[in-house]
């Protein structure tokens, strides 16, 4: 049984924000791939040039946790990492901080899920990201994460005006 710490409101802890770079556009599937320091995210096609920077926001309510690699799911964005922290909020909610490497995102789960999955800091798990928001316009290319290689497959193309 979990010891329940004092209550806190979940509102100020619901979003993570970081910079990503447009890696490629897949016009056939209407998806854009974004690169950030700890992986890639696929989002609906955005009208930004390849290599441009964007600000990404991920709401904790859009992040689920899996203990094993999720294979047969419709969620496209699945990233490995580990639970860094659990913060008990107003019942029944718990904010799970998920460490992807250099990037941290949050998942808003219930206490029941924490108990059922036996979530504890340090536990390796998968973040399943259901939605990603792009905030504002394209950013300067200075200080953007640099992918190891730029892809050149047939689906890589600039967004058509």
Language-model region placement:
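Internal alpha/beta loop-helix hairpins
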Residues: 1-40, 66
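Well-ordered beta-strand positions
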Residues: 23-26, 87, 99
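Short aromatic-glycine-enriched beta-strand elements
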Residues: 28-33, 90-97
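Short solvent-exposed strand/turn elements
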Residues: 34-42, 96-105
């Amino acid at each position: 049984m979990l010891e329940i710490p004092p209550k806190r409101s979940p509102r100020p802890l619901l979003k993570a924000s970081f910079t990503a770079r447009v890696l490629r556009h897949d016009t056939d599937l209407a998806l854009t791939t974004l690169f950030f320091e700890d992986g890639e995210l696929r989002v609906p096609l955005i009208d930004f040039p390849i290599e441009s920077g964007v600000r990404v926001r991920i709401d904790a309510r859009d992040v689920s946790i899996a203990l094993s690699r999720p294979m047969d799911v419709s969620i496209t964005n699945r990233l490995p990492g580990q639970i860094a922290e659990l913060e008990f909020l107003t019942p029944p909610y718990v904010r799970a901080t998920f460490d992807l490497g250099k990037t941290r995102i949050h998942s808003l789960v219930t206490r029941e899920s924490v108990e059922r999955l036996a979530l504890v800091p340090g536990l390796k798990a998968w973040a399943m990201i259901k939605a990603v928001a792009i905030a504002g316009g394209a950013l300067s290319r200075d200080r953007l994460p640099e992918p190891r290689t730029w892809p050149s497959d047939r689906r890589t193309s600039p967004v058509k005006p």
